[in-house]
A protein has these predicted regions:
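NAD(P)+-binding Rossmann beta1-loop-alpha1 motif at the extreme N-terminus of oxidoreductases
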Residues: 1-42, 46-50, 120, 182-184
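Short acidic capping loops at alpha-helix termini that bridge into adjacent secondary structure
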Residues: 16-19, 77-79, 189
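Small-residue helix-packing motif on alpha-helices
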Residues: 20, 30, 47, 63, ...
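Rossmann-like NAD(P)(H) cofactor-binding subdomain of soluble oxidoreductases
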Residues: 27, 36, 44-125
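Internal alpha-helical scaffold of NAD(P)-dependent oxidoreductase catalytic cores
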Residues: 92-106, 122-158, 169-210, 253
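Short pre-catalytic strand/loop immediately N-terminal to key active-site residues, enriched for Gly-Thr
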Residues: 108, 156-161, 213-218
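NAD(P)-dependent Rossmann-like dehydrogenase/reductase catalytic/cofactor-binding core
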Residues: 196-253
Length: 253
């Protein structure tokens, strides 16, 4: 996810490459950004010390070691901390980051999805101990890489399922519809192109007019026609139920 975020920031309008420092313990992971103009380091402390916004995007099992590593170099009076780690509570993070004088950083729990690489993410933001101005700054950054929603920590699990796991669910529909297109007689590449453009068209319509999906479905559903027959077959097979069950299953840890 960290690499996807860097790609999105580089394609965006807020950061110049020289504004970004990327840190990873493995040089090989940094090599893909060698020609991008960003600063590269294998020292997390070096990366964190000079940043205005420190973003930690790591696997859950290494989060504690990374956060404790950078605590001593962070200046909580001027720096904000963004943590992109699924399932990690803010209380735990703040306990790890608490300094001897009891101070903690302005914290943001952030969950984007992989489409952030193309500036098409749906990103959830939870401010913890942050000012309105700080929250405005972080939201602007993630609005530049798609769309963002400032929400409550209790909804992060559901948001992860709906938007992050949801990418995979949407792609599974694309795969299924593409395979159906092949069975109907199209070449595989043509079928995928047709399905992708159709999905894009559906999304564009909903974004443009704000209608409920069912209102748009009604526009193309003629009584006794092909569309309603297909929809009913999908429902008989449990389409809506399967989607909801998948979403609910994805929120259980």
């Amino acid at each position: 996810m960290g690499g996807a975020m860097v790609n999105g920031f580089l394609k965006g309008d807020i950061f110049r490459p020289s504004d970004i420092t990327v840190s990873n313990r493995t040089q090989g992971a940094l090599d893909r950004f060698a020609d991008s103009g960003v600063s590269l380091t294998t020292d997390n402390g070096v990366a964190a010390a000079e940043a205005d916004i420190v973003c930690v995007a790591v696997k859950p099992w290494v989060a504690e070691s990374v956060l404790r590593e950078i605590k001593s170099v962070m200046d909580y009076n001027r720096q904000m901390l963004v943590v992109v780690v699924a399932g990690l509570p803010s209380a735990t993070i703040l306990e790890w980051m608490k300094k001897e004088d009891g101070t903690v950083p302005a914290l943001f729990l952030v969950i984007p999805n992989i489409a952030i690489a193309e500036r098409s993410s749906m990103t959830f933001i939870v401010p913890v101990g942050a000012s309105d101005e700080q929250t405005k700054t972080i939201k602007a950054i993630f609005d530049d890489t798609g769309s963002s929603l400032v929400t409550e920590e209790r909804l992060l699990g559901a948001g992860t399922t709906l938007a992050s796991c949801g990418i995979a669910y949407a792609m599974r529909y694309v795969r299924a519809a593409s395979e159906g297109g092949v069975e109907l007689g199209f070449r595989a590449d043509d079928a995928k192109h047709i399905v992708l453009q159709t999905v894009k068209g559906a999304v564009d319509l909903l974004l443009a007019n704000g209608n409920h999906p069912e209102a748009e479905i009604d526009k193309v559903t003629t009584p006794g026609g092909l569309t309603i027959r297909g929809l009913n077959e999908m429902e008989h097979a449990g389409f809506t139920s399967a989607v909801i069950r998948g979403l609910k299953a994805g929120t259980h840890t």
